[in-house]
Amino acid sequence: EPENFIDKKLRARWRSYGITPMLNDKQVNVYHGLSNELPFNIQQFKGKKIVTIHDLIFLSYQQLYPFIDRKIYNKKFRNACDAADVIIAISKETKRDIEKHYFIPESKIKVVYQSCDEIYYRELQQHVKDKVQEKYKLPPEYLLYVGTIEERKNLLTLVKALKQTKEIPLVVVGNKKTYFNKVMEYITANQLQHR
């Protein structure tokens, strides 16, 4: 945590520059940037540096990101990949993208798949399931999509695939972006509302 007033008020600046001296002062052995970036001055850190890269989708699908966002992400992600001793990629596809876009040697990148909290593995009691099913008027079986409803998540492709399958209902949970309208237009035009 930032220790002085300015760093507390300007957390982004602290994460980018202020944290490194503190890591050295506290004799930290390993620093792990969990979300695609490391401080810009991390080279001054005396310990080992690890970064987890979740995706480089802003490079693969540039049309989905404003120019300035792409420039900022690219600078942060490239800096992190260059500075890290080890890069954790959350999928083989992310690993390939890092190698392709940043020319990082394969030996520096390790694929570690993400998991989820143990709470999601617990079996719910039947009365809880029944209550949720009744509240949301859910069918006995369905395909569940969870994620922001935006173009890069590719919900429209899933909806198009439904048209070619047996009667599997789709339940969508997520925040709507303008892309939602495009998905709904397709659903209406292809009479998939009942799905």
Locations of regions flagged by a protein language model:
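Carbohydrate transferase catalytic cores enriched for Leloir-type hexosyltransferases
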Residues: 1-195
